[in-house]
Design a protein with these regions (language model features):
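Polyanionic/metal-chelating signatures
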Residues: 122-125, 130-259, 387, 422-427
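His/Asp/Glu-enriched, well-ordered alpha-helical/loop segment
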Residues: 93-95, 100-104, 111-112, 234, ...
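Histidine-rich, glycine-flanked metal-binding segment
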Residues: 36-78
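Glycine-enriched alpha-helix->loop->beta-strand junction motifs that scaffold or abut catalytic
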Residues: 252-259, 276-283, 311-313
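C-terminal cap of metal-dependent C-N hydrolases
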Residues: 30, 34, 41-44, 368-411
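Bacterial N-terminal signal peptides that target proteins for export
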Residues: 1-10
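N-terminal signal peptide c-region/cleavage motif recognized by signal peptidases
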Residues: 12, 17-19
Length: 427
């Protein structure tokens, strides 16, 4: 089943006569997966006007006169893919510290650190991600020695300087082994620090009038944690072990005002029923099927399948190389299908479900009033050999070039023995 998208659509239908005066694109002859109760529409025409979906219907009759027409040639059309956990745009070269803004190990601050302040929309990883069909990315900071990693963002992959959609989308907190090591050496220490931090944030600024330090946070971090501590901002909790996830569920029941989602969740299937009852979403990587640590001994390729079957709100991410390979979220979804996840559920897990988790209104579906993030494919989007032919972000047809494709085109046609461009043989 595809989870219902909680969004408010614009009332009324747009008249075809009014389409011509706006920027209009019509994608015809498409197998369109809508992400709604409408399901997959064969021989569909998708009409986009001024950055929004205006109509989805069968057949090509009555197209707007001034529409740019793209023939999908029977191929798939889907909503733009959302990568729900990555560090795209925060790192250019992993081995060069000056280009790495994922963490700040020497900083006095933790929650106050905003990934948006280091995000580069023109990083070479952004077009690499976009040309694979990913139109929106959730970008998280990395812990720099504190269980509170900082605050993440949501951006589109257009590469424009205005591509950040939400520069303060969530707070990332690491529990389990990582939280224990960063909070004093044990899980109880991590939970004690979290409770103290919530108290500091909820009593800000009163308890800081005479002092700069609270029980767990500085004045600056306590102020930054305030919205999340009051349930006004999402808290992403990184946890893998079943007992750690169970503790998060119990903590959420104790603090009903908090908005919590799990990221990681390698053993989440063991507590799937509890997660479903608590309505706590989980972001998992279907690739994670081996016990990389003692908190992942129960990792299995059927984690995603078991979570979805239990009714857990489940999204997929690729976490193996989160700085450069957010695009592989599609391969993760394909692996989930290979291990029993329904094809519709897998597509939902990388479109409508992450939009729901991160509160992205009118995103992740193809229906009237939705944002026109749309991808045209040359095959099944979850097949590893398929690729996009067109990527639209807010109704704009995007460049399908990246640094890698330019290098390919530059050198692929060299004659045998020919020197690369910018190199000349000596006379």
């Amino acid at each position: 089943m595809i989870p219902a998208k909680l969004s408010t659509l614009a009332a009324g239908a747009l008249m075809l006569a009014g389409f011509a005066s706006a920027q209009t694109v019509a994608i015809t002859n498409a197998k369109t997966w809508t992400g709604t109760a409408q399901g997959t529409v064969e021989n569909a025409t998708v009409i986009m006007v001024d950055g929004e979906i205006a109509e989805v219907r069968t057949g090509e009759n009555g197209l707007p006169a001034d529409a740019e027409v793209i023939d999908a040639e029977g191929g798939w059309v889907t909503p733009g893919i959302i990568s729900p956990f990555s560090r795209t745009g925060l790192v250019e070269v992993n081995a060069e510290d000056s280009t790495n803004d994922t963490y700040a190990g020497a900083s006095d601050y933790s929650i106050a650190l905003k990934a948006a302040d280091g995000f580069n929309p023109m990083a070479t990883t952004v077009p690499v991600t976009r040309i694979e069909g990913v139109t929106r990315i959730v970008v998280a900071p990395r812990s720099g020695g504190d269980m509170f990693a900082g605050r993440g963002l949501v951006a589109n992959t257009s590469g424009g300087q205005d591509s950040i959609i939400d520069d303060d989308a969530f707070v990332l907190i690491r529990m389990g082994e990582a939280g224990a090591s960063n909070a004093g050496g044990s899980r109880p220490a991590a939970w004690a620090r979290l409770r103290a931090a919530l108290s500091d944030a909820r009593t800000f600024p009163a308890r800081f009038l005479a002092h700069n330090e609270g029980d767990a946070l500085t004045r600056v971090d306590a102020q930054a944690f305030g919205p999340a501590a009051r349930g006004q901002q999402l808290i992403l909790v990184e946890a893998h072990r079943a007992s750690d996830i169970k503790r998060v569920i119990e903590f959420a029941r104790e603090s009903t005002e908090l908005n919590i989602a799990i990221v990681g969740g390698d053993e989440a299937w063991m507590v799937a029923e509890d997660l479903a009852n608590a309505k706590i979403p989980v972001i998992v990587d279907p690739f994670q099927n081996l016990p990389a640590s003692f908190e992942q001994l129960g990792a299995t390729a059927e984690n995603a399948k078991r979570l979805i079957e239990a009714g857990v709100i489940t999204s997929f991410a690729h976490m193996g190389n989160d700085t450069h390979q957010a695009r592989l979220v599609l391969q993760s979804a394909g692996n989930a299908v290979a291990n029993g996840v329904d094809h519709d559920d897998a597509l939902a897990a990388i479109t409508v479900v992450p939009a729901l988790i991160f509160g992205l209104e009118n995103v992740g579906t193809i229906e009237p009033g939705a944002v026109a993030d749309v991808v045209v494919w040359d095959g099944d989007p979850l097949e590893v050999m398929s690729a996009p032919t067109h990527v639209f972000i807010n109704g704009q047809d995007q460049s399908m070039e990246s640094r890698q494709t330019r290098l390919r085109d530059r050198y692929l046609g060299l004659e045998a023995g020919g020197a690369p461009f910018a190199y000349k043989r000596s006379e």
